[in-house]
């Protein structure tokens, strides 16, 4: 804004002082009931938010652009700006306009960023991540300020894997790494901050002060110097943005306890969204029958980080088994957990003193259910008894809140009406005064009507004029002389009297005192609850786990899942396995397949570590491979699985290479994407991994493709030794089973019926002898003419007639102009040619060839 200070109003000077401090944010500047934006902020915001751009002081040559939004609907606008990667600084009026001399005092109370904002109704974690690479290791701090989680850990693996594991809303990076990390995290919101904020000693001190400990040894964090640097920088960033940072403590993440799923695997297995981008058709869509926000978070987190610890997995199996075996228990739990509030986030709001009366009341109602919840779990099984013992009955806290709050307290602390009658004697007195005063108003209205003879006279109130007497125009001649005119309307006049002003002062004074007192007492109440927050948080975690187990038990019971066996062996054995999502879509009538055909899998023994899977398109190869990967994944989150029997040897990582659509938009060819993804698998897979490869080599020429696919399978067999499902159209690859003992051929069975094929969807040992491509093309609806021509070409190929195929006569008529040399040769009468003529004709033909 190129306007001199002298030309600016006091308000705009105040705004510019604020903007100077928060140059990297869009400032929401509170003016009455609106947040206003000015200058460049207004230009940006108006485009993103789709609101009208106007200007301040339009009469001046250098008018200042501005736009505004109502403060009460700010959340949706803030969310849009954050989604675009902007920060939003909330600048509030902290002074009272009634008592302020001159301009009202304003101050930025909070800076919202993509990693620190909780949109309405979002149940998942809102992670902010800080990374610090140094000396071959990457230090990572991960926090969710809405649930109080704070993790530190280090890795020497690809940083992209860690980002994709947690999908943070915002990533903090040292400014010096901007160029080197830009591409790896291009699709995430990132903030580059000064390198000195990652200084180890400064970060260490910041962590000690924040968590109020003498040493980080108590958290087992001492040895993770890079993670400490990342953690200290993260806390400083939150502090600078005036965010509450009430964390439960530091937790060190041990990556060796979790299976790693990269973005490609999550996408190809459709874990969180289907390939069309919707939640329906994904694995979480099938498994999520959670009733609480805590349970929903637990399920999503565990799907992102499946377990490698067998005893933890078995513990979850035990819980699901207990719930599956007792329908009445499940029913009781559902009634208790239904509509349960997010008590983890409420507890954090209590710690940060940002809780409102309505939320506190919902906490009270939830805590009242804990004794019943404990009773339902008591003395059932070992796992349920441990959950019973993990829950705290906070009856003292329930009584404290119940004695204080009304049945339906307001969502805003300034509204009043927070406390019950009888809770505080001063509140009772002020309420009585307010009630009596309103009676006085009604009495005064009746008296004034009687005195003046104006039956339509009424006493009203608005925020601008306060209380007033309103008289319609036909009755103005009856107005007494002591009435003071205040406002003229189209059909009436408004007046005040000295008596009415005195009464108004009494009422307004009582209202103001009442609101101030209720605010003070509410803050006192919240402070008195602070000692209970750790137990509330603990209850939230336990209820989340119970809800998670209950959800998986409901799904297992409804869809006939079984408890898998799980061990450290390398064998995966599945009897009558089913694809959990496709089976569900068929049940709902959204896929018209009749019924899902189950299939077996045995992979891992020395003679069957790699399966080469052949068969026509549409026969079910991809479904089969995906379903087995999903069954492994489900087992390792502790879920029952869709099969008659399953034995799963722990998998450290699932790799998938299917499709390439995401990268085509980035200008990479299909084949290049195949090779990049395949290289990633070959470089990172271990003997404990489970690999799914679909049509490797299809993006190049046939011989190149076969050669690459062949060598990839050989490399996996001889070097990596991972359990692998390899689907291919290259039937030549089935010869590998004769060269390498660890490979077996399997195919999808089809039945031929004349020119038609029937997909039986069954997997059996052996290789496919045909691709059935023409039959599949017929099913897809290709024109008959094309199908007939394809059969003709196929017949010639099968006879190894690789010469140029004759073009159909109809095509010759339209397009073929003939070969002139061939035409000339056909005209020659050999019997009538003497040697001289023959040499001459040969010379002509040679010239024609030259010209051609």
From Swiss-Prot:
GO biological process: mismatch repair
A GO CC term assigned to this protein in UniProt: cytosol
Protein name per UniProt: DNA mismatch repair protein MutS
Family the UniProt entry places it in: Belongs to the DNA mismatch repair MutS family.
Binding site for ATP: 615-622
Protein purpose: This protein is involved in the repair of mismatches in DNA. It is possible that it carries out the mismatch recognition step. This protein has a weak ATPase activity.
SUPFAM superfamilies tied to this protein: DNA repair protein MutS, domain I (SSF55271), DNA repair protein MutS, domain II (SSF53150), DNA repair protein MutS, domain III (SSF48334), P-loop containing nucleoside triphosphate hydrolases (SSF52540)
UniProt GO molecular function: ATP binding; ATP-dependent DNA damage sensor activity; damaged DNA binding; mismatched DNA binding
NCBIfam families: mutS1 (TIGR01070), PRK05399.1 (NF003810)
Database matches in PROSITE patterns: DNA_MISMATCH_REPAIR_2
Keywords, alphabetical: ATP-binding, DNA damage, DNA repair, DNA-binding, Nucleotide-binding
Disulfide bridge partners, by residue number: none
């Amino acid at each position: 804004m190129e306007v001199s200070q002298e030309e600016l109003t006091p308000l705009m000077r105040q705004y510019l002082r604020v903007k100077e401090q928060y140059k990297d944010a869009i400032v929401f500047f509170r003016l009455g009931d609106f947040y206003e934006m000015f200058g460049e902020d207004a230009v940006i915001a108006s485009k993103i938010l789709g609101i009208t751009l106007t200007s301040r002081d339009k009469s001046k040559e250098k008018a200042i652009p501005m736009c505004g939004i109502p403060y009460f609907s700010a959340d949706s606008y803030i969310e849009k700006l954050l989604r675009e990667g902007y920060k939003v600084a909330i600048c509030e009026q902290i002074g009272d306009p009634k008592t302020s001399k001159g301009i009202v005092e304003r101050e930025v109370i909070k800076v919202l960023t993509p990693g620190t904002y909780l949109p309405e109704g979002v149940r998942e974690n809102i992670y902010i991540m800080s990374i610090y690479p140094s000396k071959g290791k990457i230090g990572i701090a991960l926090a969710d300020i809405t649930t109080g989680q704070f993790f530190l850990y280090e890795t020497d693996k690809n940083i992209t894997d860690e980002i994709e594991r947690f999908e943070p809303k915002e990533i903090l990076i040292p400014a010096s790494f901007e160029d080197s990390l830009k591409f790896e995290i291009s699709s995430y919101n990132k903030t580059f901050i000064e390198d000195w904020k990652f200084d180890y000693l400064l970060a260490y001190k910041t962590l000690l002060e924040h968590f109020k400990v003498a040493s980080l040894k108590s958290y087992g964090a001492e040895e993770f110097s890079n993670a400490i640097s990342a953690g200290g920088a993260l806390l400083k960033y939150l502090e600078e943005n005036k965010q509450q940072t009430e964390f439960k403590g530091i937790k060190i993440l041990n990556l060796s306890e979790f299976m790693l799923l990269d973005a490609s695997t999550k996408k190809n297995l459709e874990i969180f969204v289907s390939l069309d981008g919707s939640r329906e058709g994904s694995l979480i869509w099938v498994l999520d029958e959670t009733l609480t926000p805590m349970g929903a978070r637990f399920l999503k987190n565990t799907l992102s980080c499946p377990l490698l610890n067998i005893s933890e997995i078995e513990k979850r199996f035990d819980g699901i088994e207990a719930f599956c075996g007792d329908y009445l228990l499940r029913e009781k739990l559902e009634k208790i957990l239904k509509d349960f509030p997010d008590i983890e986030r409420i507890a954090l709001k209590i710690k940060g003193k940002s809780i409102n009366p309505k939320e506190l009341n919902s906490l009270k109602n939830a805590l009242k259910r804990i004794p019943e919840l404990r009773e339902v779990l008591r003395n059932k099984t070992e796992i349920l008894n441990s959950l019973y013992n993990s829950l705290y009955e906070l009856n003292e806290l329930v009584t404290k809140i119940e004695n204080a709050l009304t049945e339906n307290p307001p969502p805003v602390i300034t509204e009043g009406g927070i406390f019950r009658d009888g809770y505080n004697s001063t509140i009772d007195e002020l309420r009585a005064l307010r009630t009596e005063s309103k009676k006085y108003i009604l009495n005064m209205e009746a008296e004034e009507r009687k005195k003046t003879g104006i039956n339509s006279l009424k006493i009203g109130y608005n925020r601008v004029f306060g209380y007033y007497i309103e008289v319609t125009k036909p009755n103005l001649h009856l107005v007494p002389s002591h009435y003071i005119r205040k406002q003229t309307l189209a059909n009436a006049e408004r007046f005040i009297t000295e008596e009415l002003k005195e009464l108004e002062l009494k009422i307004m004074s009582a209202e103001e005192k009442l609101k101030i007192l209720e605010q003070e007492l509410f803050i006192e109440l919240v402070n008195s609850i602070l000692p209970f927050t750790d137990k509330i948080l603990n209850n939230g975690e336990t209820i989340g786990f119970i809800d998670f187990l209950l959800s998986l038990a409901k799904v297992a019971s409804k869809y006939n899942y079984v408890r898998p066996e799980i061990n450290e062996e390398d064998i995966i054995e599945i009897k009558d396995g089913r694809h959990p999502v496709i089976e569900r879509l068929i049940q709902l009538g959204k896929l018209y397949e009749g019924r899902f055909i189950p299939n077996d899998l045995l992979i891992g023994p020395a003679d069957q570590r790699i399966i080469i899977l052949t068969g026509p398109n549409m026969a079910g190869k991809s479904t089969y491979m995906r379903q087995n990967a999903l069954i492994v994944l489900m087992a390792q989150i502790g879920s029952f699985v869709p099969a008659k029997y399953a034995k799963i040897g722990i998998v450290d990582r699932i790799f998938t290479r299917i499709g390439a659509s995401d990268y085509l938009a980035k200008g990479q060819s299909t084949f290049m994407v195949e090779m990049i993804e395949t290289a990633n698998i070959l470089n990172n897979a271990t003997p404990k991994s489970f690999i799914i490869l679909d049509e490797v080599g299809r993006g190049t020429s046939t011989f190149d493709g076969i050669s690459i696919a062949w060598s990839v399978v050989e490399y996996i067999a001889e070097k990596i030794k991972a359990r692998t499902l390899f689907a291919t159209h290259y039937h030549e690859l089935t010869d590998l089973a004769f060269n390498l003992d660890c490979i077996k051929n399997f195919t999808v069975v089809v039945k031929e019926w004349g020119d038609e094929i029937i997909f039986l969807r069954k997997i059996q040992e052996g290789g496919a002898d045909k691709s059935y491509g023409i039959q599949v093309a017929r099913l897809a609806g290709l024109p008959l003419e094309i199908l007939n021509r394809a059969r003709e070409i196929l017949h010639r190929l099968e006879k190894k007639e690789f010469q140029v195929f004759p073009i159909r006569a109809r095509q010759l008529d339209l397009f073929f102009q003939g070969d002139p040399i061939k035409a000339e040769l056909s005209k020659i009468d050999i019997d009538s040619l003497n040697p001289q003529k023959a040499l001459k004709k040969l010379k002509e033909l040679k010239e024609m060839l030259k010209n051609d």
